């Protein structure tokens, strides 16, 4: 069983309209039609006024939103500078790290070769299978090895410390990247708000091609010399207020 719906006209009104038309009471029939349509017209008028007020308020808020101007004039250019700075800092850190590693590798290789050069004679010494002149030469080699190792190990320590210090850019650049992300989110939010105000309606809301279209008048010429048009947001606001919206 279908639920009853409230129609635009009831049976009694329809019969009354037919009776008036059959009796030739055209004016009374027209008056009855106007009475029937009056609530519908008022509801439509109220809805159009409400939507107009919402759109007007949104446009005014959009125009006076100083945050959008600030975003365009300062925040976005500043964000580009921040990202460029992050790129520069990352590149500098990468170069410092690679330079330190390139210098460290030969030092590590030299330590390995020095150990390999001394190890055979040292092994013979541990086996007590070494001549006196070989022992003297081993002592000189060990002395040179200790001196070179001390110098190379100190340099390796400096280079490793440089690599560690080169990574301190991450804290600063991380903060900058997070700030840029916040800015992008804020811009996205403003764009969504803008699309809400000025965006297109869904396709289902568009009028069908078969329906009668209203011809656009185009821009109003000499608007400041006419009394039947409004020329600014203040006048729009006054008009809506006078209509109760």
Swiss-Prot record:
GO terms for molecular function: phosphoprotein phosphatase activity. It comes from the Bacteria. It is found in: Cytoplasm. The record marks 175 as: Enhances dephosphorylation of CheY-P. One of its GO terms (cellular component) is cytoplasm. InterPro entries: Chemotax_Pase_CheZ, CheZ_family_phosphatases. It is an enzyme of class 3 (hydrolase). GO terms for biological process: archaeal or bacterial-type flagellum-dependent cell motility; chemotaxis; regulation of chemotaxis. Homodimer. Plays an important role in bacterial chemotaxis signal transduction pathway by accelerating the dephosphorylation of phosphorylated CheY (CheY-P). Belongs to the CheZ family. This is Protein phosphatase CheZ. The gene is cheZ.
């Amino acid at each position: 069983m279908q639920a009853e719906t409230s129609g635009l006209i009831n049976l009694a009104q329809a019969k009354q309209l037919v009776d008036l038309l059959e009796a030739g009471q055209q004016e009374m029939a027209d008056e009855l039609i106007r009475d029937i349509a009056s609530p519908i017209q008022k509801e439509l008028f109220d809805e159009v006024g409400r939507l107009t007020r919402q759109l007007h308020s949104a446009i005014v808020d959009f125009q006076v939103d100083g945050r959008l101007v600030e975003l365009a004039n300062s925040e976005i250019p500043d964000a580009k500078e921040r990202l460029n700075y992050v790129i520069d800092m990352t590149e500098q850190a990468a170069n410092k790290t690679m330079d330190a590693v390139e210098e460290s590798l030969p030092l590590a290789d030299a330590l390995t070769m020095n150990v390999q050069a001394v190890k055979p004679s040292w092994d013979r010494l541990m086996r007590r299978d070494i001549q006196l002149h070989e022992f003297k030469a081993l002592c000189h080699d060990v002395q040179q090895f200790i001196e070179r190792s001390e110098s190379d190990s100190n340099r390796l320590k400096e280079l490793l410390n440089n690599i560690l210090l080169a990574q301190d850019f991450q804290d600063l650049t991380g903060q900058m990247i997070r700030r840029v992300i916040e800015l992008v989110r804020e811009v996205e939010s403003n764009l969504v708000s803008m699309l809400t105000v000025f965006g297109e309606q869904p396709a289902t809301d568009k009028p069908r091609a078969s329906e009668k279209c209203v011809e656009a008048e185009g821009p109003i010429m000499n608007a400041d010399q006419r009394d039947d048009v409004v020329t600014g947001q203040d006048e729009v606001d006054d008009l809506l207020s006078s209509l109760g919206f």
